[in-house]
Regions:
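ATP-dependent small-molecule kinase phosphotransfer cores
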Residues: 1-33
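Residue-level recognition of specific faces of alpha-helices
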Residues: 5-8, 37, 52-55, 66, ...
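Short, flexible helix/strand-to-coil boundary loops that buttress conserved ligand/catalytic motifs
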Residues: 10, 67, 112
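Conserved phosphate-donor/acceptor-positioning beta-strand/loop module used by diverse small-molecule
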Residues: 35, 47-70
Length: 128
C-alpha cells in the first residue's frame, strides 16, 4: 500500500541524505556555524544530531498556498496529506531553540541576521 511504499522510500533516502550532509558538514571547519535544513528534522530524529534547532513557522494556510504556487502540479489535498505526515507546528515550536516567523507580518531577513550575529558571537566566545 502507499504508506508502506513511502516508509520504504524514506528508509532508503533519509540515511543517504544524512550521510551526504555529514560528509559536506565535516568540510566546513572554517565556517562559524553550519545550518542543516530539512522539513522532517524532528520526524527523522535528526534534531538529535545538531546543537540547536531553528523552526521557521507560518500559518498552515500560507504554507499550503506557497507549496501550491511552487509545485503547480500538486493539489491542495496532496499538500494537506504531506503536512499531516509531519509533526504539528506547535510541537516543533515548543522544542525549538530559535524561531523565525515567516507569516508575512515580519521581515524574515532581519530575523535571520539576528541569529547569524548570535551564532557568530557564540563561536567567538567559545574560541572554537
Amino acid at each position: 500500500s502507499r504508506p508502506e511504499r513511502l516508509e520504504k522510500l524514506n528508509q532508503l533516502v533519509h540515511p543517504r541524505v544524512a550521510e551526504d550532509y555529514q560528509r559536506w558538514a565535516s568540510g566546513q571547519q572554517l565556517a562559524p556555524y553550519v545550518i542543516r535544513e530539512a522539513a522532517l528534522m524532528y520526524e527523522a530524529g535528526a534534531d538529535k544530531t545538531v546543537d540547536r534547532m531553528i523552526v521557521v513557522r507560518a500559518p498552515e494556510a500560507l504554507r499550503i498556498q506557497r507549496v501550491l504556487q511552487r509545485d503547480r502540479n500538486r493539489t491542495e489535498d496532496e499538500v494537506r496529506n504531506i503536512l499531516n505526515r509531519q509533526w504539528p507546528e506547535e510541537e516543533k515550536v515548543k522544542r525549538a531553540d530559535f524561531l523565525i516567523d515567516n507569516d508575512e507580518t515580519q521581515l524574515v531577513i532581519p530575523q535571520v541576521l539576528l541569529l547569524h550575529e548570535k551564532f557568530c558571537q557564540r563561536k567567538q566566545s567559545s574560541g572554537s
